[in-house]
Structure formats: structure tokens, C-alpha cells
Amino acid sequence: MERQPASTGSRQELGRLLEAVLSNRGRANAVFDILAVLQSEDPEEIKEGVRTCSRLFGTLLEREELFVGSLPCEDMALAGSQGATYKYKVWMRHRYHSCCNRLEELLTHPSFQVKELALETLMKFVQLEGAKPLEKPQWESHYLFPRTLFRAVVGGLLTPEDDHSLLISQFCEYLEYDDIRYHAMQVATSILARATSRQPEVSLTFWNNAFTLLSAVNLPLQEHELTNFYVKHAQTSSKWKVVHLKEQRKAFQEMWLGFLKHKLPLSLYKKVLVAMHDSILPHLAQPTLMIDFLTSACDVGGAISLLALNGLFILIHKHNLEYPDFYQRLYGLLDPSIFHVKYRARFFHLADLFLSSSHLPAYLVAAFAKRLARLALTAPPEALLMVLPLICNLLRRHPACRVMVHRPQGPELDADPYDPTEKDPARSRALESCLWELQTLQQHYHPEVSRAASVINQALSVPEVSIAPLLELTAYEIFEQDLKKMMPESVPLEFIPAKGLLGRQDDLCTQFFCLS
């Protein structure tokens, strides 16, 4: 049963208390009554209390009525000989800290609306503290940011107990601001560094929360785009690290390296590798530092190895990384299960990309073509309609491999020289073999597969056939296409059309019987 909203009387009472605190310092003790509402068990009352605290301390920050500097002990300050204004500011700053601490606790409240409102209020305080700092600058133009408060906010999101994916998605709106993004990366790095030091086994919830936050960080491509700051300053200084894209990339790199050095669940490995090539590598200060992570992922096997090859290919192609075993690892992933994995479409898209260079040696391309052809013998029709054009594209790109289709001066073969058990494509002897598998598939039961395999019977056209529309083809789609085909009005069943039940030529029945 849903709770009833807070009564109008309660809201009015909080309004009177707020007005009393802001208008008369002599009634400052009313702030305790406001803070007490934050301890209520009613979510509606808590939300009213949070809104009141937001207006109260937001106004005090703007008026600069909170103590600025290293906060002294409350009891010592009140017992000292300083003036009433000094004591009031110290006392009220302690109440402000109590409010922030309670708001941080509310980030784990069962009600999402309470958590969302607490987050909004804390971020409002971050903005106001940045504009009216509660610490004294060490020198002129010193960059001040409420790091302590902001660290508590991010720490409240990255908890090992509660799934904060929805709340983090709300926080991601603030990551559009360049200063929030920069400090969020720094705080996340420090939290990740302490993650395993406190306890050896870290919960999956923590890693999921961390990945949700990290994957939401997007850096601009040009430094002149760093103009959107959450904390407004009268003027910016080129000495501030937050205004330089180079420093943002360093923070981005440290954050991801700090995350990836831990032993992650396999589900997160896959998510990281899917985002690696377009969301992580382009923004790193030194992309080659990912080589250890990617090579380790390659050793895991299965879909993880497949996804890791994409990042390795980018490092090889764009950053001159030497990795001689790249194509051998790709070759090793070609087994019958590749047609049935979740990432089948992505794998063949990447394989087509990796084998697109015309500078690859002929023996290597021949090994891939032969392995694909051998696997095609047991592949389902939807996979064959994708694999067969890919094999033909390999032959188009590398004319030296066409001897596998037609070898006029070749010797007679009584056995296939290709060794399917050889892991090294250079030793598989694929170039000495032929693609007899394609001729076998010309007798396939599905006419579209038979037609695709028959392409090699003719001279291959120069332009390649795009396999992109075929990557995600399913058996259901093939079945639907067959159902939608328009059949001719009369289906020919014999070479000579029959005329009646006994109308065949040379039929003895027609010679002696007549149906009337």
C-alpha cells in the first residue's frame, strides 16, 4: 500500500522553521528540528526535509554565513573568546556537515525518489561550495573544488551492497560538465585502488556500479571543447589541470587501468571489450598500455578472445604495435561453435575487417578460406549465406589464392593436403589444397545456399559482395522469405504436360480405356 504524501501542516511547519532560521540568528536552534525530519521513516516527510535543507543551507552558502577555513572543534569554538558571529558560523557549519552526512546516508534509502532528491541536493551543494569555497585559497588564482564533499557523493554511488545503476544514470547527467567529469575520474580511481585492500573478495555489485560509472565517461575530442564547467568561476586559469584535455586523458587512463588491473567477472570482461575500441582506446593518453589486458583477455578463450582481438587490431593498425601471433589467434577461434555464439555477427564482421588488407600473404588468406570452407560443411543455412560470400571476397582480394578453385597445371590429388588440426596457418598447407567443400555445397538442400556456392563456377566479379546485410540473418528470417516468395501459377512436375488422368503419351491405358 502506498504511503500518503506529507501533510500540508508538516510542510508549512518546515517553512516556518526555515524562515525562522534565516531571518533570526537567535532562533538558529530550529535547524535541529529541520534535520530531525531527515531521520523520519516516511519517504514523503524525508523529501520535504531534504527540500527544506536544500533551501536553508543553499541560502547560507550564498550569504557566506558558514565558517571558511579549517573547521575547529565545535565545543572549543563555542567555549572560546571569539565573537558571536564567529561562533555562529562555526556552529552552523557543523550543522551543514551533519546535513551532508545524512544526505549521503540517504543515497542508500529504499525509495528511489529519496535517493534521487538527496543526490540532486548534494550536487547543488557541490556547485555552491565551488562558487563560495569553505576553504581558503593557498595562493591567488588557486583552483578550488569541494573535493571532500564530492568524494563522498561518488563514494556513495560506488557501494558494494546496493545496485546503484539507476542512480548512477541520473548522476551521468553531471558528467557532461568538464570539471565534474575530471574529479569523478580522480575519485573513482582512488576508490578502485582501495577496493581490494579493504577486503580480498569484492562483490559483483561493486564492480557493476563501477563499470556503469566508468562507461558513462566520454571525453571531448578537441581541447577547445572544454568550456562547460559546473562550478562557475569569475575567470579560468591555464594553470588549472581541469581545463586541459591532456590532463583529462591522463585521468581517464588512470581510471580505466586501475579498474582493469583487478580480477573482473567474465560478464564485465565482455562489456569492457565491447566498448574498448570506440569508447576507451581513442581517449587514452597512451593506448599501448592496454596491451597487457588485451593479451590476457586473448588467453581466456571463447567470446572474450574474439572481442579482445578488435582492440589488438586497433593497436596494431593505428599505434604500430607488434603482435605476430594476432592472425594465429584469430585462426584458432575458427571452430564449429563460432556459428552458434552470441557474438557471431560481430566476429565475422571483425574477421572480414582483419582480412581486408591486400598485403596479407597468400598462404595466410588461403588458410582462412580453407578453414571457413571446411566449417561450412556442417554450418546452418543462415551461417552459410554469410560465410560463402566471405570466402569469395577473400578470393577476390587475393588472386593468388584462386588456384584453390582452378589449378590447370596442378598434380592429381588422392587426398586433401590441408591439415585441419594444425594451429599455425603457415603450416596448414591450405594453399596446396582446393576448395572442394564449395563444390559439395552446390548440392545443398537449400537453393539459396546452392546458388551462393555456385558463384565459384564462374569468373568472380571485381566488386566485392557486402556481407553486412547477412551478418545477423536468422533461420526464422530465411523461413519467412521462403513463405513470401511468389510461386508460378502452374508448377511443372513433368517434362511433357499431362492431359487428363490418362493423357500421357505411350500410356497403355489410353489405348484400351476411355473415361467419359
From Swiss-Prot:
Keywords: Membrane, Nucleus, Transmembrane, Transmembrane helix. Pfam families: CBF (PF03914). It is found in: Nucleus membrane; Nucleus, Nucleolus. Coiled coil: none annotated. The chain crosses the membrane at residues 296-316, 347-367, 375-395. It comes from the Eukaryota. It is a multi-pass membrane protein. One of its GO terms (cellular component) is nucleolus. GO terms for biological process: ribosome biogenesis. InterPro entries: ARM-type_fold, CCAAT-binding_factor, Noc4. Belongs to the CBF/MAK21 family. PANTHER family: NUCLEOLAR COMPLEX PROTEIN 4 (PTHR12455), NUCLEOLAR COMPLEX PROTEIN 4 HOMOLOG (PTHR12455:SF0). This is Nucleolar complex protein 4 homolog.
